[in-house]
Amino acid sequence: MHAEYVDADQVATLRGLLAGSGWLERARIFGRALRTTPKSAGGLLVVGTPDFEPWHLTAHLDDESRLSGIAALAPTLVRWSPPPGAPPHLAVGLARLEAAQRGETLFVVTEDRAPVPLLERVNDARKTGATILALDTGEGDPELDSIAHEALAVPESLSFDAGQHLVSAAAGERDAGGGRKRGLRDRLARLLDSVSGPTA
């Protein structure tokens, strides 16, 4: 998360996350699921809605995979309508969801309620053995969350973009002894220091 994208209200919210709201801990648990449920490179399938493609989160997860050395965290962006001639990494369509299987993870990212066609595909992927993770907002999406093995809602006081940054950072954390030097709480504290001075 870049400091220039964080305003005063978000600084207050982020400080609240550090102060023990519980959300940061839930994000860490969710990040661990992102990190451990895909069993091979290419097995983390990231999909949004017809109106929202999670480009930025996919890029952040790719960075975290590279920095942490966790190959299975490298995401595959699944798109509703890839344009003709798109490069291979941007040409993966919904047929990939139909091929999802045990050992793969379908990560659904949506700021709005998931449309019925998406819910149907997600449910089918679960039936074939894929792990379903969901990131949404506010009080969550009841229908999507009921299908997901793990779901996390970004609080309304935090932008969805900021929430995606924090989730991707959590996914890149190593477990104790794994050698990752900067944990999620550390990274958030450094961000706040750069924006408004040291945290209490």
Describe every region a protein language model picked out:
Residues 55-176:
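Glycine-rich phosphate-binding loops that contact phosphosugars or nucleotide phosphates
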Residues 10-14, 27, 34, 90, ...:
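Generic structural signal of hydrophobic/aromatic residues within well-ordered alpha-helices
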Residues 1-74:
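Extended, compositionally biased accessory segments flanking or bridging domains
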Residues 162-200:
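A charged, well-structured terminal subsegment
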